[in-house]
């Protein structure tokens, strides 16, 4: 199978999955719980859930993004002068971030996730200082800045727009197969245009609660291989209220 036909196959499969799985579940969830609707929708939902046992693996990021947002993940072309200059400036910005954090004595925080959030602020400031106007991406529908979710940074250079996600990693986890990249459907996607997508990831070293930056990687994500994991979830309100299908059997104080 050729690359183009394989790409088309991924696109077709993913579009079918979205249609077959997500649409019926959404419709069933929106239907009032009336006597005439319940049996049919129950069967429909069970059928869809059965199909969800089929796992989707190794779907390229560009296929997923276009299916979810309608926007393309563009190819990073090192022979494109604008792309080459962006990469050069990203390297300079990454070095600036490392130097500033080192001069500050590192980042001290008990929560490693917060370390990543702090680094994001350094990255946006350094990129902007290097001539790449970097901001928090805005939702395509609302136009409001959205911090949570992929990607972390939207930036522009010479009239071309780009996206970048900031990450941290430990040297010992580089070959880990645990999930570290997430992309979810949204009614207000942060991806609002065709663009090249990057990751800037800093390797960290830790001494107590203080983190230093050791090295960095810049990665182009166009063909990043993604797996799709289906997940059902709930929350404390539904778990412990005795409503929404749960039944509290005991609720007593400990002596």
Q: Over which residues does each language-model region extend?
A:
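Interdomain/boundary linker segments immediately adjacent to catalytic/signaling cores
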Residues: 31-122
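Catalytic cores of nucleic-acid endonucleases
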Residues: 166-211
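Bacterial N-terminal signal peptides
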Residues: 15-24
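Domain-level recognition of nuclease-like catalytic cores that cleave nucleotide substrates
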Residues: 196-254
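Conserved catalytic cores of phosphodiester-cleaving nucleases, focusing on short active-site segments
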Residues: 153-155, 162-170
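A short acidic/basic microdomain associated with nuclease active sites
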Residues: 120, 124-156
